[in-house]
């Protein structure tokens, strides 16, 4: 299949060069490219998503070159294991990485953050939502992705928009969620939001499960037995597929399947494997901005390079991570950690790929201004349906029953 990443391309320490020097910032010329140590789970149970993120980084190289940036990408696979992420981060630093970038999985991202802070090396988090990472007073950590609290709050507030737009509001819901670091942090955020009384429905039951589970029949049966009108989920990719397959098998037809902000249901593999049963699932997540010229360029390059793959937030945030690193280097004019960190603190990128305002970081190193769109699978593709300003399709809610789809 075209677009599939070879082992050679993904080899540890593989480097790709984008651009040459020549720009002067703060009176210092860029005499060498910035070495970005990129960490992702390109093997193990998160491999498909890790490889999707890698595509966004790889495509950033020629685009950044055209923009006049000078960067080199050093790749490392942490095999979907946080302990391996730690050792890989240490290896990249030993081999000369000036800045680290990663890492999708929250446990691994936290491990890398600890290594980066210990060594005084800047770490840009392109995807990773564990709240504690930016609550520990770290000086070298900068996150462009929303925390699970921001993600959940944005996603849960979008539920009311969905119900208002459709004219249908469920009174009850059941929650199925993964029990890993990400799933637990999302659960805490959902509980906190529910305690405010802002949820338009009552959660009747909360069902946790291992994201590496091979069978979810018991969990789905329990969810069905709750008798809730809405099925709310916090998933990864493989478990999301298992869950919907089991819902079809057990003839469990809620009004809708909605995530307040998790991967899985908008991923290409989910759409391919489940076919018509993947349609009408909704995920409330940060999404690509159709009005940004940089997004148009990235989308065009992506579809040309990977015609069989899905262009989604994994590629978008991964690209933005590369852009953030390159922009900081150009303004710092130096690869010294302190200079890069100071430049990162002053980041203000109006031209970006994702919806939301300019990329910037607060005193904790967090971009606080990300927003979420309601992204619904329609006709085998993830399509933003809300807010209206970013919509590219029309919301369908409640969803048709599984046995009513042609």
Regions found by a protein language model. Give the residues of each.
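Extracytosolic ligand-binding ectodomains
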Residues: 2-13, 23-25, 29-406
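Alpha-helical DNA-recognition elements
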Residues: 16
